[in-house]
Amino acid sequence: MNKLLPLFFINLENKIMKLPNYLYLLTIILYTSCNNNSDLVKKVAGMHQVIKTQYAPDKRVAVFDVHFNFSGDKMLASGMTDSKEAYLQLVASLKTMEIAFIDSIRVLPDTVVGNKMFAIARNSVINIRSAPKHSAELGTQGLLGMSLKILDKQGDFYRVQTPDRYISWVDKGGIQRMDKSEFNAWNNAKKVIFVKNYGYVFATKKSNAGIISDITLGGLLKYVSENATFYEVEYPDKRTGFIKKSESFIYKNWLQQLQPSKESIETIAKRMEGFPYLWGGTSSKGMDCSGFTKMVYLMNGFIIPRDASQQIKAGKAVDANLDFTTLEKGDLLFFGKKATTEKKQRVVHVGIWLGNDKMEFIHASGNVHTSSMNENEPNFDEMNKNRYLGSKRYLNVKSALIIDLKSKIKL
């Protein structure tokens, strides 16, 4: 073995660790092709890609960030994954290949998180970012009372997974950490859901009282008691307050009376008209295109994937001829760049078909508004008609990616 190889990888590591995994491994292969480890690295690279494709094909919902380099006469396997199965398969594969290696792989969550591996959102809306810093891109948002799984910690930020499986970072001020027993107690407790677009939790049973916090559409709090006009509620951090009954429901009762339909999809969607566009927004304070469709379906009793490029993978394909004739109210329309011989299809936008004679759909772009696919209508949307990719139907369709709130939700 080339004695300079370990030093070479140490010096090179800082530059190439930031590359995507496949480029990182390709770089290793190219630079080791003249030594005895090149065949070994190629085999490991192939094995790594197979496992990643099986367990973490989408890094937004799964973690498999594993790297390989050399330390002395042994290969060092480092990084992290949130899949114990992926880790075990990786280790077994390396042993089967009779590769001596140093195991420095973290299986999340681990001791960095401790026994409080769960959390509940404690603010009206929590901002969940792509990296552990306040200046990072907004990836998604969580609503008050939302259940979260904690995977990792870095500084004042926690890497969390939301019920739709999305993984990003939230600051410690937005969540109440819990151990498993506390988390189960919260989830099993009687709840109150807020059903108006925006409002307040009051300090006393008077609408002119001081406020404990604001609250937005879909927010959940623990039920304590009630009188004729207010529910007394408790936050995950034990604060208490009062919500107007006219703006909320007992969550269990709300779920039971839900009857998702084309009309209810349209009703909820139109209640959000004029809401501002916010990249990564998933609340009534602001929403992007897929955050809008996600909120509409949430208030109809379903958790759907977070991003448009994920939402297109759920449901039943409709409108094969791309002429809008077989669409029904409530179907999701997807837009973007069509596939070519060189590039895959790229989904960048989504809206909801309204099924009227104006050929209208409602979507978040600038703000939430209606547009038309009919060139004779004043709100004709030529740009989106030209980049229309197809549609999916969610209502009355069984799909592993569409979670019914009436079912037991696992984190």
Regions found by a protein language model. Give the residues of each.
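Active-site nucleophilic cysteine motif
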Residues: 269, 281-300
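Aromatic- and glycine-rich peptidoglycan recognition patches
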Residues: 176-180, 184, 207-209, 249, ...
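SH3/SH3-like beta-barrel superfamily modules
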Residues: 74-76, 80, 139-171, 213-245
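Bacterial Sec-dependent N-terminal signal peptides
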Residues: 1-42
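Beta-loop motif signature
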Residues: 121-147, 194-223, 277
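Boundary regions of SH3-family modules and the immediately adjacent low-complexity/disordered segments
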Residues: 84, 88-112, 162-193, 206, ...
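N-terminal targeting leaders
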Residues: 22-25, 34-76, 80-141, 146, ...
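...with weaker cross-activation on analogous glycine-rich loops/strands in unrelated enzymes
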Residues: 304-370
